[in-house]
Amino acid sequence: VLSPADKTNIKSTWDKIGGHAGDYGGEALDRTFQSFPTTKTYFPHFDLSPGSAQVKAHGKKVADALTTAVAHLDDLPGALSALSDLHAYKLRVDPVNFKLLSHCLLVTLACHHPTEFTPAVHASLDKFFAAVSTVLTSKYR
């Protein structure tokens, strides 16, 4: 459960990210593919070389979904229902991959915003990504 302090940290951090969210999403996907090569199996039709246009475009989709989630912190299941359906029923993404991407998102944000990435912000973002992952995998059960 996200506390009021968590919600403040998440919204504040996302505001600071601003127009870079799509770039960071692409970078986090690059990190995920490089660090956890098994995640590439879901993208056989993509050019998975670092910085490819397809990875950047999908990273922007990830970032846009997270931006939607940030705007609906009190109703993540409602805000992400269609995305949950897509990943569970059509794409059938192994739930562990959400944890791997979440880790890479945290690393990417910490690299770009080291001053703002305090222990409290880190904890809040970790809880947020875990909550999003839980929603995205909720229809697997």
Swiss-Prot record:
The modification Phosphothreonine is found at T8, T108, T134, T137. One of its GO terms (biological process) is cellular oxidant detoxification. O2 binds at H58. The modification Phosphoserine is found at S3, S35, S49, S102, S124, S138. Gene3D superfamilies: Globins (1.10.490.10). Keywords: Acetylation, Heme, Iron, Metal-binding, Oxygen transport, Phosphoprotein, Transport. The keyword Phosphoprotein applies. Residues 1-141 form the Globin domain. Belongs to the globin family. The sequence shown is one of two non-allelic alpha chains from dog. This is Hemoglobin subunit alpha. It comes from Canis lupus familiaris. The gene is HBA.
